[in-house]
C-alpha cells in the first residue's frame, strides 16, 4: 500500500487543484493524478493515483514526492475521490475560493 498525506483540494473560479505528498518505494517512481475512466454524473471528480516507475536502477529508499492535479471546469466540483489499486484512499471536500 502507498502512503499519502497532506491532501488538499481547492477550486478558484474554474481551476480545480488537488495536491498531496505521496511516499514512494524509490526516487525513480513518479506519482500522478489522472481522471478516472469512470466518473459519476454529479459534481464530484474521481482521480486515479498512478505510480510510474522510471527506467534504470534506483536505490530502494522510501521517498516523499509531491503530486498535483490541475484542470479547468465549467462547474463547481464539490468532492474529489482519489483511487489507488481499485480502492478509494482519500475523499476530499473541495474548498471553493473566489
Label every PLM stretch briefly.
Residues 1-98:
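Exposed, flexible binding/inhibitory loops of compact, secreted disulfide-stabilized domains
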